[in-house]
Every structure is written in C-alpha cells, then in structure tokens.
From Swiss-Prot:
CDD domains found in the cross-reference section: cupin_HGO_N
Annotated metabolic or biological route of this protein: Amino-acid degradation; L-phenylalanine degradation; acetoacetate and fumarate from L-phenylalanine: step 4/6
UniProt keyword terms in alphabetical order: Dioxygenase, Iron, Metal-binding, Oxidoreductase, Phenylalanine catabolism, Tyrosine catabolism
Alphabetical list of Gene3D superfamilies matching this protein: Jelly Rolls (2.60.120.10)
Annotated protein name in UniProt: Homogentisate 1,2-dioxygenase
Co-factor(s): Fe cation
Species: Pseudomonas putida (strain W619)
C-alpha cells in the first residue's frame, strides 16, 4: 500500500458544510455531479447518509470521484471470527461501574477489539445506540465499513490514524472522530496500542445542538470541527474489505485499495473535534445548571428536545456558584446515562471511577456524588475553584440501555459500586433549620 506517513495533515474547517476537495487539479466536475466522462477517467458515485427527501438542512450526501466504483467487489462471506455481539444481558435496574479493560496480549486490530458494553436497539432499527470499548495493539491491514450506524470514536489511550475514503484524520485522547455510516476506513496505531470508547448511532446523524437563549456562540463552535482533504491510494493487490451488517462481520477480497477517491464534494463526511476547544458555560450566580449545557453533539428523535443520543462532556471549568452544593446533584433521570473517563478524575466521584472505566445509570436509577465527595462539598470553602486536568463524558439516550452478557460477566465489573453511597448519613434535625 502507498500510505502517507506525514505528521502534518491538512483539514477543512466547519460543521455541516458543503465541502469540496480534490487531490488532483480539476478532478472535480464543474457544474454537474455525474458527467458522461468524469475527469481523469474516474467513476462518479453517490454516498447517501440520509433519505433523498429529507429537509435540505438535514440532508447528508457526498459525491465521490474514484478510480474504481464500490460496486466492483465479489460476494461477501460471513467471517468465522465474529464480534462479541452476543445477546443483551438480563434486565437489571442496578447501577453498574467497570474498571478499565486490559489491553490485549494477542495481536488485535481496531475492529477485532470491540467489547460490547450496552445497547438499546437492534442494528436493524432506525434509532438507538450501541456502546463499545475498543482495545487494540495492531494497525489494520484490511478496510472496514459499518452498515449498522454512524461511529463516534472517543480515544482514551493512544492515537488513531484513520484513513477514510475522503482522506486522513489523526485523533488523540481528548479529541473525537465521527465516521458516517457506510464510509470505508482503516485504523492505524501510531503509538502501537490504543483504548477508547465507541458509540454506534443507529439513528439520525449527529449534529450540533440548538443554542436557544445562549445565543449564536458557545459550546462546540462549528469552525473547530475538521474534515479531511482528498487523499487516494492507487494500489493493486489483495485487500480484505470487511463490513458490519446487522451485528455480523462479512468480508470479501478486493484486488485494489478501496480508499481510492481522488476528489469529492458534499456534506456526508468524517470529521474530528478537539474537546479542549469546547466553550464551557456555567452559572455565575448560584446552583448547578443542567448537564445539557455540556452537550457537544446530539442525534435527535421526532420528539422535539428528546435525544436519540447526546454526547456530553465534563471538561475543565471554574466553579464559582455562591451558597451552592457544587458537585452534580443527586438525580433520578428519565434518560439513560453511560459515562466514561478520558483523563483525570470526575468531580462527583472521589475514587473508583478511573480513566478507561465506565458506568451505567439507567432510567430512574438514583445516582449522584459519592459519600466522600458529598461530605467535602457541604463543608467546602466556596471560594472560586477550578476543576482542572479532567475530561469525562456521557452518552445519554432516551431509550433504556441494557448491558451485554460480556459486560455483566467480565472481571472489570465492580461488585461493590453501591457502597460508594452506603455511608451517606442522615443529618436531618427538625429542631434546627
């Protein structure tokens, strides 16, 4: 394979833009999408990420101008080695927390290293989300695409170099990458090993949340999202193309690289975002605002304001609220919360929640700061204080998340999670207000 190893990649800035990029001058047709003879003898191909008749503001589609059309492939065969996508575990209302998953000892590439954690929908449904933790120690030689959903990738350890049909992305911990449904890609590991989280979004593509009375600026700013520039591989020789289809891996062997797009234009693109650029908002008077003010991306449902999935972060920020219990409050939620930790510590948990770990609080599961955090917060001097050197996140969804059998049976599941609240005392005194 002819692969670009340059450390300085170029990107296109913006979110939801109608981008255009070409690796050879004049490779993009002018004034039309599908000319009788495309420049350089290329094939025109459309990749649709939404239905043709969606509102124009919600359309996602990209025209590709490639050396060989995607239709040039033999029959897909079901692979003998299948992902750990077993049945979901039994129903449990219990709060769950996991220690970090170990890195593999055997050679494991990106798509072999997915551990299913929770899900609320089968892959053939038009909504829902499945969550995985990935652990890998070998760069991919094959190419992959996911027919089941859009992928939101959250590295916790190790950089990822993602070669996509539209170009190259490199992401490190505290950055994220999003790969559209059906987009072919290959993941290389510049640091030799990697671990992180994946949300597989089966619903509407992720978008920026509405800002409402916040105004026209704040949270994740559109210009900080970066899409790749056109980059193609012109290579002949056997390449395995793997697709995930209804939770199963199927593959065929090509005699060329499928990452052969010389030019493209459209809005259905992979992209990256640096979480450290998030414009964090919070109170400058009293009380702790709702965590929705930390939303980076959202996948909506047909009910206005109800998310199929929100991606929320808890970044470094100043705490200045007066006469206020400053940690996230005790809560019972209509939504379902899967949390992970990229670095540092989470301000509602003094211990037990580690980078690479995870927790699940289902619908109406009572949760909140642990006993140690609560005791310190009640007694704290309420001077301005910065929560620093941290990055936690949450996948929040309106449908109940059920843990997988693998997640329920793995040794990383903490048997004593409930004990972090067990020593919360009763301080009620009816004679003293």
């Amino acid at each position: 394979m002819n692969r670009d190893t340059s450390p300085d990649l170029q990107y296109l800035s913006g979110f939801g833009n109608e981008f255009a990029s070409e690796a050879l001058p004049g490779a993009l047709p002018v004034g039309q999408n599908s000319p009788q003879k495309a420049p350089y003898g290329l094939y025109a191909e459309l990749l649709s990420g939404t239905a043709f008749t969606m509102a124009r503001s919600e359309l996602r589609r990209t025209w590709l101008y490639r050396i060989r059309p995607s239709a040039l492939h033999p029959r897909f065969e079901r692979l003998a080695r299948q992902p750990l996508n077993g049945p979901l575990g039994g129903v449990t209302p219990n709060r769950l927390r996991w220690n970090p998953q170990p890195l593999p000892t055997e050679p494991t590439d990106f798509i072999e290293g997915w551990l299913p954690m929770v899900a609320n929908s089968a892959a053939d449904k038009p909504a829902g989300v499945s969550v995985y933790i990935y652990c890998a120690n070998r760069s991919m030689e094959r190419v992959f695409f996911n027919a089941d959903g859009e992928l939101l990738i959250v590295p916790e350890q190790g950089r990822l170099r993602i070669a996509t049909e539209l170009g190259l992305l490199e992401v490190e911990p505290q950055e994220i990458a999003v790969v559209p449904r059906g987009m072919k890609f290959r993941v290389e590991l510049p640091d030799g090993q990697a671990r992180g989280y994946i949300a597989e979004n089966h619903g509407a593509p992720l978008r920026l949340p509405d800002l409402g009375p916040i105004g026209s600026n704040g949270l994740a700013n559109p210009r900080d999202f970066l899409a790749p520039v056109a980059h193609y591989e012109e290579a002949e020789g056997p390449v395995q193309l793997v697709q995930k289809f209804l939770g199963e891996h199927w593959a065929c062997e090509l005699q060329h690289s499928p990452l052969d797009v010389v030019a493209w234009h459209g809005s259905n693109v992979p992209y990256k975002y640096d979480l450290r650029r998030f414009n964090t908002l919070g109170t400058v008077s009293f009380d702790h605002p709702d965590p929705s003010i930390f939303t980076v991306l959202t996948s909506p449902t047909s009910v206005h304001g109800l998310a199929n999935m929100d991606f929320v972060i808890f970044p470094p920020r100043w705490m200045v609220a007066e006469n206020t219990f400053r940690p996230p409050w005790f809560h019972r939620n209509l939504m379902n919360e899967f949390m992970g930790l990229i670095s540092g510590a989470y301000d509602a948990k003094a211990e037990g929640f580690l980078p690479g770990g995870a927790s699940l609080h289902g619908v109406m599961s009572a949760h909140g700061p642990d006993a140690e955090t609560c005791e310190k917060a009640i007694a704290a001097d309420l001077a301005p204080h910065k929560i620093d050197n941290t990055m936690a996140f949450m996948f929040e969804t309106s449908q109940v998340l059920r843990p997988s059998l693998q997640a329920l049976e793995c040794p990383q599941l903490q048997a004593d999670y409930d004990s972090c609240w067990a020593t919360l005392p009763s301080t009620f005194n009816p004679n003293r207000r």
